[in-house]
Amino acid sequence: VDGGRYAILGPSGCGKSTMLNIMSGIVKPSEGRLLFDGVDVTEETTSDRNIAQVFQFPVIYGTMTVYDNLAFPLVCRGYDKAFIQSKVNEVAEALSLEGLLSQSARKLTADQKQLISLGRGLVRDNVAAILMDEPLTVIDPDLKFRLRRKLKEINQKYQSTLIYVTHDQNEAMTFAENIIVMDEGEIVQVGSPAELFDRPKTTFVGYFIGAPAMNLFECNVVDAHTIKFGSAKISTETDLKSVKDGNLKLGIRSEYVQLTK
């Protein structure tokens, strides 16, 4: 855990949520091992992993106040009242919930309820990472950008590792420092938003990242740094010595096309 912001991105049904649930311990992998900082935690219980999880739909205690919701993890661990009050007030201020602490949690808006779910992870000093499974699904579109910005502010303030699952490339590209792209249960590429956009390693990533998608064309290798596309020859910095002719495609982003007279 390094305090970074990560996104797991892919189409519906590709295994994103399953991977997240394996990380948290809700699901046990059928094979393989799970390592955190090189330590095998495959057999560790959910509570022993020191992971907080924010689900697609807000999980709150509707009969409690906002304050009691945020305090609940600390109360369960036996912290004294003075520490709990200090920590809850600190987190509530960071999440802009300080004016709502005495209100019933069930009366809040969907975005406020989701912030409570996030806050319950932040009040704990021992949380190694906060896992978020499509946390903005129930949030109005005009609030999504504001909440993503709030999440980035929280990451910078607390240096908490945030892992964000989404099928929305815009959410992933504007939130994460590094993105794990999945397709059909496999990780197909890991990289920064710029790396995924400019240098996709598979046709799937080329099509999936970007709006519009990358234009892909069949091409042939001429030599180590030249390809042939139709009647044109194009030089590239990429070393093509190990590339087989039949596996090569030329990718062009429309954003980089310039027309000259």
Give short role names for the model-derived ranges.
Residues 17-20, 116-118:
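ABC ATPase nucleotide-binding domain helices that frame the ATP-binding cleft
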Residues 9-11:
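The feature captures the beta-strand-to-loop junction immediately N-terminal to the Walker
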Residues 50, 60, 64-202:
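ABC ATPase nucleotide-binding domains
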Residues 24:
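Helix-to-loop junction immediately C-terminal to a conserved catalytic motif
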Residues 6-7, 53:
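Short beta-strand immediately N-terminal to the Walker A/P-loop
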Residues 32-40:
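Conserved ABC transporter NBD signature motif
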Residues 226, 230-261:
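Glycine/charge-rich catalytic "coupling/switch" loops of P-loop NTPases
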Residues 27-28, 35, 75, 156:
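A position-specific signal in ABC ATPase nucleotide-binding domains
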